[in-house]
Amino acid sequence: MTSFPHLETDRLKLRSIENSDAVKLFEYFSNREVTKYYGMDSFKTLEEAETLIHTFQIGYQSNKLIRWGIELKETNELIGTCGFHALSQKYKRAEVGYEISHLHWKKGYATEAIKTILDFGFEEMEMIRIGAVVLLANSPSRRVLAPLGFKEEGMLRNYIIQDNIPCDVIMHSLLKEEWIKSSYR
C-alpha cells in the first residue's frame, strides 16, 4: 500500500487518523464504558491519545497495522476507529479491532464500518483469514461479528489483562472463501 486508503459507506467515511483527532479520541477513550473490554485503561491525559495516534501512524508505515478513523458523513464527526492489527503479509492474515464512542452505540455504525474494511482486507490486501479476539464478557462486540459471518474458534484463557485481572477471550475468525460466498457482503 502506498497512500492511505480512504473508504466510504452510505453514512461513514473511513479515513486516516490525524494528530488533530487527539481531542476526539481522548473524549471516548477516557470513557470507561468504551475501554472496559479493550485490554487497556481509560485515558487520563490528552498525551495518551496523541501517543495512540502516533502508534497507528508508525504501525501503518511499517506494515504492522492499519487503523481508520470512523467519521460521520453528515457531521464530519469522528465517532470511532477500526482496522487491522497483527498483520502478516507472509501468512495473509490479520486481526480486526474497533471501538465506537458510547454516544453512537446501537446505530449499526460498527457493523457498517467493519463490513467495509473486511471487503478491503480480503480484496485489496489479499488476506485469507481475519480474526477477532473478544473478551468473553463483551457481548456487544460478539453481536457485531456474528452477523458478518465470524465463527467462534475457542477460548484463549487469561489472554488479556484488563484492570490488572487476567481475562479469557474468544477467538473468532472469518475466511476469505466464507466471506466471498456469504450474504453478509
Language model regions located:
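Active-site rim helix/loop that mediates acceptor-substrate recognition in acyltransferases
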Residues: 42-63
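A short gly/proline-enriched turn/hairpin at secondary-structure junctions
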Residues: 35-43
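Hydrophobic residues in alpha-helical segments
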Residues: 29, 38, 60-61
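Acyl-donor (CoA/ACP) binding surface of acyl/acetyltransferases
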Residues: 1-35, 54, 67, 71-185
